[in-house]
């Protein structure tokens, strides 16, 4: 039985979330907190398997509450937020930085066209994220210092030939992406393209949070746009995003892959097909196997491939599936991925 603590200052929202979850035979709501202070007490007293966290609450907001819980009694936390308020979305990603695993939209009212999809997404998130092993966050948590050059030997042909870096991520991805790009130099000589599995409505907030927290330029990809070096592009909601041979974005509304659109598989496959050996593919932490076979295609077509290592992954599903296929040339933690990219940048300039 999955034991859930609900945190929200709205009695109506608490009632709605409880009514959704109590229909599930494997889920039990063991408590409700109306503010952050109650949440901290109940998290310690009840030891839930997972907490759903609101952001805008009196006295102690969701960001501060998440931070204190992760410092004292670490437990999987998902942020359940509205998607109509950009400031609330931005605050949601600050909570991710403090240790929350993911951000999801609050289910709309019954009868709304998106109700069934949102409810299914919420319930699946409870089941999925309750299994993630989390660690205690230090109160004096600091950003990782700028990494030195990687000790990994990068073949000369690789650092001369790469034209684009494509990245796929799911569970734990935002934190890892933040760590990687915060350690890239200004004027990084290559474009980066990211597919991040995320609840609809939060991609713009993700891009804003990454830009503000790292100083690295991040934007939402646009169809036909020419990729520029030194910039991270994030695939938009609901659209498969690919790259062409002349480094432009191509979009598609073809059926979802792995029940996902955009999918990592679509991005990686387009890069392997259109750019061959000129691609660096990186597959980060996440559930399932999205992108694993296509990472192998990048490697088979002469590109360079990296998977996040098991120890640093929140969930080793996607990189683990790639490892089983021998798709990754390198298996690295985030700090080493950043070092690899810095070395790639520095050696290209020699």
Swiss-Prot record:
It is an enzyme of class 3 (hydrolase). SMART domains: REC (SM00448). PROSITE patterns: CHEB, RESPONSE_REGULATORY. It comes from the Archaea. Its EC number is 3.1.1.61, 3.5.1.44. The modification 4-aspartylphosphate is found at residue 54. It is found in: Cytoplasm. Residues 3-121 form the Response regulatory domain. Residues 158-322 form the CheB-type methylesterase domain. GO terms for cellular component: cytoplasm. Phosphorylated by CheA. Phosphorylation of the N-terminal regulatory domain activates the methylesterase activity. It catalyses: [protein]-L-glutamate 5-O-methyl ester + H2O = L-glutamyl-[protein] + methanol + H(+); L-glutaminyl-[protein] + H2O = L-glutamyl-[protein] + NH4(+). The active site is at residues 170, 197, 290. InterPro entries: CheB-like, CheB_C, CheY-like_superfamily, Sig_transdc_resp-reg_Me-estase, Sig_transdc_resp-reg_receiver. One of its GO terms (biological process) is chemotaxis. Keywords: Chemotaxis, Cytoplasm, Hydrolase, Phosphoprotein. GO terms for molecular function: phosphorelay response regulator activity; protein-glutamate methylesterase activity; protein-glutamine glutaminase activity. Its main location: cytoplasm. Belongs to the CheB family. Contains a C-terminal catalytic domain, and an N-terminal region which modulates catalytic activity. PANTHER family: PROTEIN-GLUTAMATE METHYLESTERASE/PROTEIN-GLUTAMINE GLUTAMINASE (PTHR42872), PROTEIN-GLUTAMATE METHYLESTERASE_PROTEIN-GLUTAMINE GLUTAMINASE (PTHR42872:SF6). Involved in chemotaxis. Part of a chemotaxis signal transduction system that modulates chemotaxis in response to various stimuli. Catalyzes the demethylation of specific methylglutamate residues introduced into the chemoreceptors (methyl-accepting chemotaxis proteins or MCP) by CheR. Also mediates the irreversible deamidation of specific glutamine residues to glutamic acid. NCBIfam families: PRK00742.1 (NF001965). This is Protein-glutamate methylesterase/protein-glutamine glutaminase 2. It comes from Methanospirillum hungatei JF-1 (strain ATCC 27890 / DSM 864 / NBRC 100397 / JF-1). The lineage of its organism: Archaea, Methanobacteriati, Methanobacteriota, Stenosarchaea group, Methanomicrobia.
